[in-house]
């Protein structure tokens, strides 16, 4: 921090560890934001991918341990926690999902826990994980963004997966004709076939925008809230590195206050992502508009 300006410090913490095709024709890691940008579409955010997979495996291992230790007698703390979580998600699905599917509840549970774990990385002090990456790599300038949900590629990827399920179940339940009819015959209709034909482009435009808005809103809502939260933590860290005693003291107070408040944010954002997924899939299972 001492060798960086506040602006450089912030930019460094908001840059991903990117692997891709370098300008010299070789494959490797980008060391600057400009190099990462030049890599284009086929660049991989290694930090986002690594943390997403690692946290997904942690989720699977925790629930596998709970399942193996499950007993009909006196349950342990882990079993109690998992049962409460499963009951909570199952209740949310029963309240909001009006179709019949054995997939929705496990999907909702996976989304909630996985997104929560990715969000929770934001509670780790902002310098710890990047400094660990520097020690492992031996590169003092290597960028490393630790929170996957502050990367729009991660949130958009999850949202597009949900969107694919929306399209799949819409066609499965309503048929291809019903799905096309839903996009072209609503919200405006007429008994006159000629008028109805004229309304098809208007209906399609409105319904298509509504359909596309679902994954975009899912992705941007999660990304925006988590990115803003991470930026606040980074700005507080800048206070610590200011060299001014009173500003560092204020940073300590703000760090703890924001961390406590942020626990609510990371939980709420995971819950909202899960609930919107349930609602969107419930709408896809409805055989009427």
From Swiss-Prot:
Query: Where is the protein found, in the record's own terms?
Result: Cell inner membrane
Q: What's a single GO CC term here? A: proton-transporting ATP synthase complex
Q: Which PROSITE patterns does the record cross-reference, listed alphabetically?
A: ATPASE_A
Q: InterPro entries, from UniProt?
A: ATP_syn_F0_a_bact/chloroplast (IPR045082), ATP_synth_F0_asu (IPR000568), ATP_synth_F0_asu_AS (IPR023011), F0_ATP_A_sf (IPR035908)
- Major subcellular site: membrane
Q: What's its membrane topology? A: Multi-pass membrane protein
**Molecular functions (GO terms):** proton-transporting ATP synthase activity, rotational mechanism
Q: Which SUPFAM superfamilies match?
A: F1F0 ATP synthase subunit A
What is any one GO biological process for this UniProt entry?
Answer: proton motive force-driven plasma membrane ATP synthesis
Chain segments annotated as transmembrane? 43-63, 101-121, 160-180, 193-213, 232-252, 259-279
Q: Which domain of life is it from?
A: Bacteria
* Keyword terms, alphabetized: ATP synthesis, Cell inner membrane, Cell membrane, CF(0), Hydrogen ion transport, Ion transport, Membrane, Transmembrane, Transmembrane helix, Transport
Q: NCBIfam families, per this entry?
A: ATP_synt_6_or_A, PRK05815.1-1
Purpose of the protein: Key component of the proton channel; it plays a direct role in the translocation of protons across the membrane.
Subunit comment: F-type ATPases have 2 components, CF(1) - the catalytic core - and CF(0) - the membrane proton channel. CF(1) has five subunits: alpha(3), beta(3), gamma(1), delta(1), epsilon(1). CF(0) has three main subunits: a(1), b(2) and c(9-12). The alpha and beta chains form an alternating ring which encloses part of the gamma chain. CF(1) is attached to CF(0) by a central stalk formed by the gamma and epsilon chains, while a peripheral stalk is formed by the delta and b chains.
Family per record: Belongs to the ATPase A chain family.
Output this protein's name.
ATP synthase subunit a
Tell me what organism the protein belongs to.
Pseudomonas savastanoi pv. phaseolicola (strain 1448A / Race 6)
């Amino acid at each position: 921090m001492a060798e960086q300006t506040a602006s450089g410090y912030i930019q460094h913490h908001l840059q991903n560890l990117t692997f891709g095709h370098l300008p010299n024709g070789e494959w490797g890691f980008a060391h600057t934001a400009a190099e990462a940008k030049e890599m284009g579409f086929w660049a991989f955010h290694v930090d986002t991918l690594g943390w997403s997979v690692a946290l997904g495996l942690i989720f699977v291992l925790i629930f596998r341990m709970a399942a193996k230790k499950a007993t009909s007698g006196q349950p342990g703390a882990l079993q109690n926690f998992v049962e409460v979580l499963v009951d909570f998600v199952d209740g949310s699905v029963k309240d909001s999902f009006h179709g019949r599917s054995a997939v929705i509840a496990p999907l909702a549970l996976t989304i909630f826990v996985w997104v929560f774990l990715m969000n929770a990385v934001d509670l780790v002090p902002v310098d710890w994980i990047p400094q660990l990456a520097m020690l492992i790599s031996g590169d003092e300038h290597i960028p490393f963004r630790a929170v996957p949900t502050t990367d729009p590629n991660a949130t958009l990827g999850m949202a597009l997966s949900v969107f694919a399920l929306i399209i799949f179940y819409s066609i499965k339940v309503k048929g291809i004709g019903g799905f096309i009819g839903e996009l072209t015959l609503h919200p405006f209709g007429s008994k006159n076939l000629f008028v109805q034909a004229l309304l098809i482009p208007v209906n399609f435009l409105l319904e298509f925008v509504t359909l596309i808005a679902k994954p975009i809103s899912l992705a941007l809502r999660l990304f925006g809230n988590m990115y803003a939260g991470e930026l606040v933590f980074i700005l507080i860290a800048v206070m610590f590195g200011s060299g001014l005693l009173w500003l560092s003291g204020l940073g300590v107070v703000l760090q703890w206050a924001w961390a406590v408040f942020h626990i609510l944010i990371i939980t709420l954002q995971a819950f909202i992502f899960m609930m919107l997924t349930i609602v969107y899939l419930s709408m896809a299972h409805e055989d009427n508009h």
